[in-house]
C-alpha cells in the first residue's frame, strides 16, 4: 500500500484551481479525497469556462507537458546512438505518454493517470484519425514493436529478458515522430 501523502495548499489557491476546472483539483473532489475542514471555508463549484479561459489553460498545460515529450525523445535518440536500446525504449515510452497527455490536456483539460500506452492511445484516437495510424498493426514486426514499447515502462527497468534491437528502436522512434 502507498503511504499517505500530504499536500499543503491554501484554500484560495485550491478554490481558484477548482474554479478553473484544473484536473488535479477536480479529481480530489470527485474522488472524495479527504481534505482538512476547519468549517471556515467552502469549496468553490467550478464555473463554465469561456473559450479564452479554455484556450489559455490548454496552452499553459501544453507548454508544461509537451517539452518533456521532446526531451524524452532526445534521450531516446542518444540511447540509440549509444547502443542502450532498452533505455531508449523506456525514454520513448515516456515521450509517448507525455504526447498523449498533451493531446488530452488540450482537448479536454484532463490528464489521465495511466501509464498504459494502449489506454492513452485509445482515449486520444477520437480526436484525430492520424493518431490511430501512428502505430501500425499489419505485420508481426509492427505488432511486436508496439508491444515492446507498451511494455518498456516496467520491463526495460526490471525484466532482464526484455531486449530491444537497434532496428526495433529505430522503427519505434520513426512511429513516435508521427505522434509528435
Regions found by a protein language model. Give the residues of each.
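Catalytic core of pol beta-like nucleotidyltransferases
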Residues: 2-82, 86-91, 98-180
Amino acid at each position: 500500500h502507498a503511504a499517505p501523502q500530504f499536500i499543503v495548499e491554501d484554500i484560495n489557491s485550491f478554490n481558484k484551481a477548482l474554479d478553473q476546472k484544473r484536473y488535479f483539483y477536480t479529481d480530489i473532489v470527485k474522488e472524495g479525497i479527504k481534505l482538512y475542514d476547519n468549517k471556515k471555508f467552502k469549496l468553490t463549484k467550478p464555473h463554465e469556462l469561456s473559450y479564452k479561459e479554455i484556450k489559455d489553460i490548454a496552452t499553459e498545460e501544453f507548454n508544461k507537458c509537451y517539452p518533456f515529450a521532446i526531451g524524452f525523445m532526445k534521450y531516446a535518440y542518444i540511447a540509440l546512438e549509444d547502443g542502450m536500446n532498452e533505455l531508449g525504449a523506456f525514454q520513448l515510452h515516456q515521450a509517448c505518454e507525455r504526447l498523449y497527455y498533451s493531446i488530452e490536456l488540450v482537448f479536454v483539460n484532463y490528464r489521465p493517470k495511466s501509464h498504459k500506452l494502449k489506454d492513452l492511445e485509445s482515449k486520444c484516437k477520437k480526436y484525430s484519425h492520424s493518431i490511430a495510424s501512428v502505430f501500425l498493426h499489419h505485420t508481426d514486426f509492427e505488432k511486436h514493436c508496439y508491444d515492446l514499447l507498451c511494455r518498456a515502462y516496467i520491463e526495460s527497468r526490471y525484466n532482464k529478458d526484455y531486449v530491444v534491437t537497434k532496428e526495433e528502436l529505430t522503427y519505434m522512434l520513426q512511429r513516435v515522430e508521427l505522434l509528435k
